[in-house]
């Protein structure tokens, strides 16, 4: 059994929203927060986010992006990270009760998302659906 903290050099946690995305870069296996930032959810903002992560991680493509809402608000960022060569996973379900009374902010949520992925086995990661084949064709038909 190999957990994320032992097999990945970095985990990038993302709290995705309609207008902005908060990112936190954690070093594995310690979980040390290397840096945090927020970017607009625009095409230029997504490109800046991917470039920012590349600078923080030495462009190590073994880094794992853990994104909240890869099927909704985080979909475009997930696609941008995957297109850059990074592995992407959906954020694990979090225990709200464990975080009660600690505070809530987007950067803090991004950090918690990354921390929640560290002890997971790779088989427990929820991978995003691919946007290819029949799925892409149906999306085009529905949009027209």
Language-model segments: residues:
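Phosphate- and other anionic-substrate recognition elements at nucleic-acid/protein interfaces
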Residues: 1-144
